Every structure is written in C-alpha cells, then in structure tokens.
C-alpha cells in the first residue's frame, strides 16, 4: 500500500478495505514496508528517472518541449486521476493541447495516485480496459 492516496481515501476510510483499523496503522505499515523491502539505490534511481526524464532533451528537439509533444504520432489517451496529488490533471491538459491524435479522459478516484494499482479501483480498471480496447481497435 502506498501513501499517494487522496484526502477522500482517508475521509471515506477506504484503508479498512485493506484490513487497517485506522489511517495511522496504514501509514506505519507503509513505512515499515519501505524500510524493510525497498533498496535505497532503487529509490534513488527512480528519483533520478523522474528528475531527468524530458522528451525534449537531445539534438532532435533541442529542449523544445512543445515540439517534442507535437512529434508524437501514436494515438494517445491521457488518463490522469483528478485526485492524484503527484501528477496533476492540469499537466495532462497542457500536454493534450500539443499531442496530435490525443484525447484527455480524466478519472475520479479516491485512490488518487494509487488508482491504477491492480485491485484498488474497479471503476478505474473498467475505464482503462475500455480505453486500451479503443487504442488497439
């Protein structure tokens, strides 16, 4: 279980679905899991990927982010979670303006950043399956 959950998750006490009596129990479990099971080097590598990931870097786009977005040719569906506190829907709205053949389909989920975790949100999974089928058809 991750801490990237929305305020609604805690208000709705959805942590009980995972067997926790209260939010504090959930957070302690998360901290223990990360301390015992996550290698610090893996976390540092993940952070570095987030910090350095930029499709506009390099000689082709010369740091022109909009030009890089406009070069995407694949049919694209952007599915941000409106309650994600890490990756905001506003960012995808901006990107959607420049990606040809893209559509923006935000999803509401109390699971926030964790909406896409398998088993968390059946509505998210249904929407994801529907959009994948559309992309592949």
What are these regions (language model features)?
Residues 37, 63-66, 82-89, 119-122, ...:
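Short, well-ordered coil↔helix boundary/capping segments
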Residues 47, 80-83, 106-109:
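Active-site proximal loops enriched in glycine and acidic residues that flank catalytic Cys/His/Asp
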Residues 1-74, 86:
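Alpha/beta-hydrolase
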Residues 93-137:
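Catalytic active-site module of serine/aspartate enzymes centered on a nucleophile-bearing elbow/loop
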Residues 67-77, 81-103:
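Conserved loop-alpha-helix segment in the C-terminal half of the alpha/beta-hydrolase fold
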């Amino acid at each position: 279980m991750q801490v990237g959950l929305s305020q609604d998750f805690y208000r709705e006490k959805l942590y009980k679905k995972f067997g926790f009596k209260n939010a504090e129990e959930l957070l302690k479990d998360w901290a223990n899991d990360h301390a015992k099971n996550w290698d610090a080097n893996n976390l540092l590598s993940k952070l570095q990927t987030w910090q350095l990931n930029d499709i506009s870097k390099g000689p082709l786009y010369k740091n022109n982010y909009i030009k890089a977005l406009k070069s995407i040719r694949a049919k694209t569906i952007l599915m941000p979670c409106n309650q994600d506190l890490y990756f905001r829907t506003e960012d995808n709205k901006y990107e959607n303006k420049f990606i040809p053949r893209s559509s923006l389909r935000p999803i509401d989920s109390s699971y926030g950043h964790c909406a896409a975790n398998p088993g968390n949100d059946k509505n998210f999974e249904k929407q994801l399956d529907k959009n994948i089928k559309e992309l592949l058809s």
